[in-house]
Swiss-Prot record:
Family: Belongs to the lyssavirus glycoprotein family.
Posttranslational mods: Glycosylated and palmitoylated by host. Glycosylation is crucial for glycoprotein export at the cell surface.
Name this polypeptide is given: Glycoprotein
GO biological process, one term: entry receptor-mediated virion attachment to host cell
Lipid-binding residues (covalent, S-palmitoyl cysteine): 479
UniProt gene name: G
Protein's cellular compartments: Virion membrane
First-listed, main subcellular location of the protein, grouped into a coarse class: virion
Length: 524
């Protein structure tokens, strides 16, 4: 993080940044001097604009930071994780089913995440049903895979919103920040590819509820706006203001560090990068009310001094000090040279420390150089003492100094990294600790016949089956050949039995048993 001291550098570089709440005011532009009568003396109205003759006051509305607005704007969101739950079943030969669940991840789409979040927030039973594992299917001797693509919604997941560039800061984001949330892109990537972060409210601008409408008086000269009197009665000049967006709302950062949004035709430059604004809290409001009361009191003291001058017809350096303008801007300076009352137009600037205007003994710095004195007299009651030191009759009230210190300390840091360790994701595959399944459609895939063997076992089984088939073929072929040999042998044996010749004892050849029988009978 940026060191807190560095955040104040822009305010310390420019003395005018402390604007309406200095410890003292002194002209940075002065002259020329001209003699006047005591009837030309007047008290400055520090609550009404006197810049460049802008005296036309009219009521108007403007927007400022809410009272009680804190530096870290919390934005509620949720994380959406894509999960694929796979149920794998195998049914063996005897019908025994084995089920194995596996879990993988995928990157979800923002639209699907928003729909799932709405389901969860509305209490839709479909979200509760989606938390179950997929119901597995099974087939005999086959491996069946049933998958569910689920969306896991975890809420709340709080991020810090930077009002300057509308970036988000949390440890769940890569590098701790996300600057891509806009109308066209309503999600942030996280430290895991399968998880995205989305704001609970799809309209990001509604989450930046830090503004309030106020009423005041606009000070203008023609079409040019010089400044305005705020709702608490304190005048704020637009001189030196710059344009600055907070939460996408265009406004003006004034020289005192406050931020307002108001319509003006003035040409205004953009603020430099890294420019900060002051917070608006109850304490600053209370002090500003006290400042207004103090300025009113100072004006009453000035009027009393002016009345004393008119009554006694005499002027002193102490009384002239009451006529000094107490806030930066255009006004008058008064002095007495050679018993003559003198007046000069002046533009006052704020002073933070006395060393700024009294850098050394006897030197009153005005406009960057030591201002000459006339017989030990400067202006506005400032004189040179007998010892050669510059004597200033009074200084601003302690309330103004207190308010100035408050404005210096109340700035919005540029970065607001979330320090809540409960939302830090773990490395590796440990993200499954927070995964709860959200169920979309079911997809089934049925494999071929599977005996449940590993790859090497399948090859052994195929080899054994091929060998067995080969042996069976050889056996069948052998049997077939034996059958073919036995049939011709039996046929030949039957033919020989009918044609065989028998030789009797008499030596006569008998062709057959029948011939032998008939011959024997005849002989007999």
């Amino acid at each position: 993080m940026v060191p807190q001291a560095l955040l104040f550098v822009p305010l310390l570089v420019f003395p005018l940044c402390f604007g309406k709440f200095p410890i003292y005011t002194i002209p940075d532009k002065l002259g020329p001097w001209s003699p006047i009568d005591i009837h030309h003396l007047s008290c400055p109205n520090n609550l009404v604009v006197e810049d460049e003759g802008c005296t036309n006051l009219s009521g108007f509305s403007y927007m400022e930071l809410k009272v009680g607005y804190i530096s870290a704007i919390k934005m509620n969101g949720f994380t959406c994780t894509g999960v694929v739950t796979e149920a794998e079943t195998y049914t063996n030969f005897v019908g025994y089913v084995t089920t194995t669940f596996k879990r993988k991840h995928f990157r979800p789409t923002p639209d699907a995440c928003r729909a799932a979040y709405n389901w969860k927030m509305a209490g839709d039973p479909r979200y509760e049903e989606s938390l179950h594992n997929p119901y597995p299917d099974y087939h005999w001797l086959r491996t069946v895979k049933t998958t569910k693509e689920s969306l896991v919604i975890i809420s709340p997941s709080v991020a810090d919103l930077d009002p300057y560039d509308r970036s988000l800061h949390s440890r769940v984001f890569p590098g701790g920040n996300c600057s891509g949330v806009a109308v066209s892109s309503t999600y942030c990537s996280t430290n895991h590819d399968y998880t995205i972060w989305m704001p609970e409210n799809p309209r990001l601008g509604m989450s930046c509820d830090i503004f309030t409408n106020s009423r005041g008086k606009r000070a203008s000269k023609g079409s040019e706006t010089c400044g305005f009197v705020d709702e608490r009665g304190l005048y704020k000049s637009l001189k030196g203001a710059c344009k600055l967006k907070l939460c996408g709302v265009l406004g003006l950062r004034l020289m005192d560090g406050t931020w307002v949004a108001m319509q003006t035709s003035n040409e205004t430059k953009w603020c430099p990068p890294g420019q900060l604004v002051n917070l608006h809290d109850f304490r600053s409001d209370e002090i500003e009310h006290l400042v207004v009361e103090e300025l009113v009191k100072k004006r009453e003291e000035c009027l009393d001094a002016l009345e004393s001058i008119m009554t006694t017809k005499s002027v002193s350096f102490r009384r002239l000090s009451h006529l000094r303008k107490l806030v930066p801007g255009f006004g008058k300076a008064y002095t007495i040279f050679n018993k003559t009352l003198m007046e000069a137009d002046a533009h006052y600037k704020s002073v933070r420390t006395w060393n700024e205007i009294i850098p050394s003994k006897g030197c009153l710095r005005v406009g960057g150089r030591c201002h000459p004195h006339v017989n030990g007299v400067f202006f506005n009651g400032i004189i040179l003492g007998p010892d050669g030191n510059v004597l200033i009759p009074e200084m601003q009230s302690s309330l103004l100094q207190q308010h100035m210190e408050l404005l210096v300390s109340s700035v919005i840091p540029l970065m607001h990294p979330l320090a809540d360790p409960s939302t830090v994701f773990k490395n590796g595959d440990e993200a499954e600790d927070f995964v709860e399944v959200h169920l979309p459609d079911v997809h089934e895939r049925i494999s071929g016949v599977d005996l449940g063997l590993p790859n090497w076992g399948k090859y052994v089984l195929l080899s054994a089956g091929a060998l067995t088939a080969l042996m069976l073929i050889i056996f069948l072929m052998t049997c077939w050949r034996r059958v073919n040999r036995s049939e011709p042998t039996q046929h030949n044996l039957r033919g020989t039995g009918r044609e065989v010749s028998v030789t009797p004892q008499s030596g006569k050849i008998i062709s057959s048993w029948e011939s032998y029988k008939s011959g024997g009978e005849t002989g007999l």
